[in-house]
Amino acid sequence: MQHRPGIAIVAGLALVAFFGACGGGSDPAQTPAPSALCASSALPSGAADTTIAVAGWPDRDYDLVLPASHACGTPIAVMVVLHGGGSNKEGMRKLTCPEGDLTSARCLYRIAGAAGMAVVFANGTNAPGGQLINANGVRTFDAGGGQNGFICVSGYACTRGVDDIAYVRALLADLATRIDVDPKRVFATGFSNGAAMAQRLACQAADAFAAVAPVSGENQFALAGCDPARPVAVLDIHGTLDACWPYAGGEGGCIDSGLYVSVADTLAGWAARNGCVPAPHATELPPIAGANDGTSVVRLDYDDCDAGGELVHLEVVGNGHFWPRGYAYASGTLVGGVMSLQLDTGQAVVDFFAGHGRP
C-alpha cells in the first residue's frame, strides 16, 4: 500500500480502476478485539493493511482511514463516504482530491483526518458485464426513485432492489467492533448516486446519522416518502450547470436518462421535515484568490430549524457534475459547466460535520 504520512489506512482487497464517477462475510469468531485492531491499524507509518468485509455482503468490503493521532479507546467521529454511480471506493477517494492527487493535504480524507475523524469509503454493488454503468469493477447504490418517470438511481443496484440501508447499517455495526465509534457523530457524504444515497440515509437511517452532505445528487428517494425518525442536519451542494443531475430537475443524465428531482424540491422537502422557515436567506461567498474560473458560490441558510436539523445549501454557480476543487474526471462537454475552484468542498463538508454532532 502507498505510504500516506500521518494517516493509517485499513484497506479492502479489491483494487479496481477508476472509471469516472457519474458517478464474503466475516467469521465473528475471528474478528479481532476492538483494542487490538485499533492498535494495529493506527500506526503512524500508515503501513497496516487488513481486509474489512461486511458480514452477509460478499464483495462489498470497505476502506477505513484513521487519523494517526487517534488513541485506541477514545470515541471518534465517523464519516461514511459514498461513491458515484459507475465508480467505486478507490475512485471516490481520488475524486475528492484536487487533480486526483492522493497525496494532497486538501483530499477529503486528509482534511477529515486532521479534524480527528475516521473516514469510511463504502462500496456499492458490482454488476457483472453489461453497460458502462454496470460494468465489472464499477458499482452503484440503490438510492431510490423509479416512480412516475423519475429515474431509479442508480443502475444495477436499483433494478435488483439491493437493500443498501441494510448494507450501511451492517457496515456501521462491523465498524463498531473495531474502533470506538461515537454514535452522536456519525455522518455521510457522497457524490452523484452516492449523494442521493446520503439523502436516503437521512430519510431512513436518521437514528444512525447526525448529518449528511450530498454533493451533486438530490433526494430521489423522497418520491416514495421520506419520514426520518428525528431531524438530520443537511448540507446540500450542487452546481447550476450540472448536465447529469440538472439543478432544476427534469430530464438529464450522462448515461442513464429519465427525470431527476430538483434542488428546489429537495430543499423544500428538508425545510418542511426539519421545521425550518421555508424561504432561505442568501449570501454570496467571497471569491478564493487565484481561482479565476468564472464560477461563484451562493450560500442559502434556512432559519429556525428544529434542533439538529440545520439546513444549508451551497449553490455553485457555473459548476457542472463535479466535486468542486476535486478531480475533473470528465469534460464539461459531457457533464456540463466546469469544475469550480471557488469551493473547497472537503473543508466545507468537514466543517459542517464538526459542528453538527448530536447533543
Locate each region found by the language model:
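Structural recognition of the beta-strand scaffold that forms the well-ordered cores
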Residues: 62-63, 78-82, 87, 117-123, ...
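Bacterial N-terminal signal peptides
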Residues: 10-18
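The feature captures the conserved acid-bearing segment of alpha/beta-hydrolase catalytic domains
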Residues: 210-307, 318
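Serine-hydrolase catalytic machinery in alpha/beta-hydrolase-like enzymes
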Residues: 53-63, 73-187, 200, 204, ...
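Alpha/beta-hydrolase-fold serine-hydrolase catalytic core, especially in secreted/extracellular enzymes
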Residues: 271-359
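A domain-start/cap signature at the N-terminus of enzymes
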Residues: 22-78, 86, 104-106, 111-118, ...
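Active-site rim elements
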Residues: 154-159, 248-259, 331-341
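Bacterial N-terminal signal peptides that target proteins for export
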Residues: 1-11
